[in-house]
Amino acid sequence: MMWHLVVQLGVFQEPARQARDQMHNFSLIMEMKITSLKILFGMRAEIILYSWKMKTLESTRTHSFIFFILFLFIFIFLTFSHNNSNSNKITSNIHTHINRHIFYFVLSYSEW
């Protein structure tokens, strides 16, 4: 059981780490573009690109937050429907398995 938990945590932590690295790389690329355009066109290009960069990052954060809330809602729904007295053993196992995956996703998200 413990080995299974360690494997599951590893599976969900790696995509979170990759996404965090991609956001960092995106930020570095944008900084390089801002610097090069600043050299070519002056300060105005930097202000325009900086505002576009902030809008892009805000929309990414918003989408991440929406998915986080969605998974949390599904987790809560499956938790309460799992305790239904007329559910059979197979449904109970499926709910437990799905809950475990959603819980690990939420854990990996909270590491960001």
Swiss-Prot record:
Cellular compartments per GO CC? membrane
Record's subcellular location = Membrane
Source taxon at top rank: Eukaryota
What residue ranges are annotated as transmembrane? 62-82
List the protein's name.
Answer: Putative uncharacterized membrane protein YIL030W-A
Lineage, uppermost ranks: Eukaryota, Fungi, Dikarya, Ascomycota, Saccharomycotina
Bilayer topology annotation: Single-pass membrane protein
| Native source organism of the sequence | Saccharomyces cerevisiae (strain ATCC 204508 / S288c) (Baker's yeast)
Miscellaneous comment as given in the Swiss-Prot or TrEMBL entry:
Partially overlaps ULP2.
Q: What keyword terms does UniProt attach to this protein?
A: Membrane, Transmembrane, Transmembrane helix
